[in-house]
């Protein structure tokens, strides 16, 4: 009998990677492994995805963990460096960086580096989060071209705000803005992340940046467009065990606050997982889990270490039986729809006490 465990399927990760190759056959792939590879384990996932052309991370610490773990392929800091003191570290470890601000540009201009750094100028085409505004972009670009600490040519990237919405006109506007700026320039281009890869093939360019789809999760909220619609397989199964099976009478409440009351005699199961493991405390009664091949609903409030589920009056489930919170047979997208929490957040917020197990052949 096991407590909360995240089982990561190497075969699913590799399958998804090859599916993405089919979606963007003329682009190279930046495997986005930030945030502990979306909860799948940073270094292990990078090793599984050893056919990636580059790895994308958010923080310099993530990049250094990859390097210390033996990863030698290019690594790109998607948010860029945070201070001038990071620059020698980037040089020493051959790490590429996004550049999106005047402060970063000045740090590059003023640094004394042993060799130039490969940079990606980030253009704000409409996300309005990071990036150089279009009206300032040409002057910014000229300074990057003139900077001896910048390896030439300068490369270009941006990020869509609504790529997971196929009917949104914003993506076309952003792409047109990007194209207007990069036209006639020689650097590599990257603008498509997961949504762009699936829905906007005209955005694929030199490199694409798969994130959530690499882990077998759809970026779209519509459950009819979950990962299996695109031939993707869930790489993570979050599971635990029944630690108690109890008779429960009609009219009896369960859990903190007595928020759920049984309408009939039934059998309740107690599962060893809770918000202390990263399972969402906000999951309402009715959120499904999978036990012995059937969905059963959570009842009552999620506790720190446990949830209760209504097994049904005739249930034959026993202590020790496996319980799947999400994975094959119960897509995380469905749990996300029930809880009101995005699938991105569900898979990345698991806590350190959740055990990690990897299945499938190693590379």
From Swiss-Prot:
Q: What is this enzyme's EC?
A: 5.1.1.1
Cofactor(s) in the UniProt record: pyridoxal 5'-phosphate
Query: HAMAP family of this UniProt entry?
Result: Ala_racemase
Q: What class of enzyme is it?
A: isomerase
Reaction(s) catalysed by this chain, per the record, are: L-alanine = D-alanine
Binding locations of substrate: 129, 304
Q: Name one Pfam family in it.
A: Ala_racemase_N
Q: Which protein is depicted?
A: Alanine racemase
Where are the N6-(pyridoxal phosphate)lysine residues found in this chain? 34
User: What UniProt keywords are attached to this protein's entry?
Assistant: Isomerase, Pyridoxal phosphate
Q: What does this protein do?
A: Catalyzes the interconversion of L-alanine and D-alanine. May also act on other amino acids.
Q: Where is the active site?
A: 34 (proton acceptor), 256 (proton acceptor)
Similarity comment text for this entry: Belongs to the alanine racemase family.
Mind telling me which InterPro entries this protein's record contains? Answer: Ala_racemase (IPR000821), Ala_racemase/Decarboxylase_C (IPR009006), Ala_racemase_C (IPR011079), Ala_racemase_N (IPR001608), Ala_racemase_pyridoxalP-BS (IPR020622), PLP-binding_barrel (IPR029066)
